[in-house]
Amino acid sequence: MAISEIVKFIHEHLHDDELSLYLVAEKMYLSYSYLSRTFKETTGVSFSDFVLRLRMERAKALLAKGSKVYDVAEQVGYKHVNYFSKLFQKYWGIKPSDVLKT
């Protein structure tokens, strides 16, 4: 198992609101605890922090291109726009709608 395969899987499924360490472990035929430990040892960050960073970076890029907040939320794996907006604001320190204005 190569971390690069896992990272590729994450990128390909970033839009999936069910993307989780459990799902990836199952798809890669690994135990949850082994994947969690190995991922952090290799990348230096936890699986959830890695996924959050990717989602927030992609969201910011999509918003900067003029995409609607509700569309972006869905494209980066969040069913609920309000939850996405709170996470985005906590992560970046600005509201998603403020990215559209800059």
Model-assigned labels for residue ranges:
Residues 8, 41-79, 101-102:
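Terminal helix-turn-helix DNA-binding modules in bacterial transcription factors
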Residues 1-2:
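Hydrophobic, helix-rich cores of sensory/ligand-binding and other regulatory modules
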Residues 22-50, 74-98:
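Basic/polar phosphate-binding segments, predominantly the helix-turn-helix DNA-binding elements
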